[in-house]
């Protein structure tokens, strides 16, 4: 029961641009190569984020802000700063949560935790073009490239129907939209992005 609650909490954390046209096959190949090359060059990332959670049964969307810090290969600190304080740290096979001062830890060694951890890290880095895991469609808009991904994994599909990544001109992710099977969705916009700046090891410890 506790694991189900944590999974739902993580997914709640994460789940339009102008007129779009589909990229040609050649354009898609070129963009994927550019995004992969850019991703390989990123060792660390820090950013502020704004999150909007839309639930059909609520008249008003839930808006939160916070900060993230990411270091390859698998260290991630996702911190909400307003209107409440909540922090979750992924490191190897461990998830540590600080819920307004109450710290708990668990092993992330089951299949769904691993899938979610990989999903979050890949979403931030933009490295999500594994066609064994996703069906991928790419579109060009006035602001950059929009990637629409449909998960193929049946376990992940229980939690996530579609994933939309919006890339800036430098092939890094500006915005993420996660759509659940219920059509509820989460939009996350990254601002003040910094790449390859030093991050103290203490950031990934609670």
Where are these regions (language model features)?
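Gly/Pro-enriched, hydrophobic low-complexity segments
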Residues: 129-135, 140-206
């Amino acid at each position: 029961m506790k694991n189900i609650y944590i999974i739902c909490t993580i997914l709640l954390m994460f789940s339009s641009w102008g007129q779009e046209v589909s990229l040609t096959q050649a354009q898609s190949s070129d963009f994927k190569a550019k995004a992969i090359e850019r991703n390989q060059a990123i060792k660390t990332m820090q950013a502020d984020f704004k999150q909007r959670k839309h639930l059909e049964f609520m008249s008003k969307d839930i808006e939160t802000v916070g900060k993230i810090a990411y270091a390859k290969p698998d260290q991630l600190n996702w911190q909400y700063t307003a209107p409440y304080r909540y922090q979750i740290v992924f490191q190897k096979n461990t998830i540590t949560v600080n819920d307004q001062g109450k710290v708990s830890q668990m092993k992330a060694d089951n299949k769904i935790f691993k899938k979610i951890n990989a999903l979050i890290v890949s979403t931030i880095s933009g490295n999500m073009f594994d066609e064994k895991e996703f069906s991928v469609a790419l579109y060009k808009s006035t602001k950059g490239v929009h990637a629409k991904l449909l998960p193929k994994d049946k376990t992940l599909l229980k939690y996530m129907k579609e994933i939309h990544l919006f890339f800036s001109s430098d092939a890094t992710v500006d915005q993420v939209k996660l759509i659940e099977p219920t059509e509820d969705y989460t939009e996350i916009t990254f601002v003040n992005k910094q790449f390859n700046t030093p991050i103290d090891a203490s950031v990934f410890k609670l």
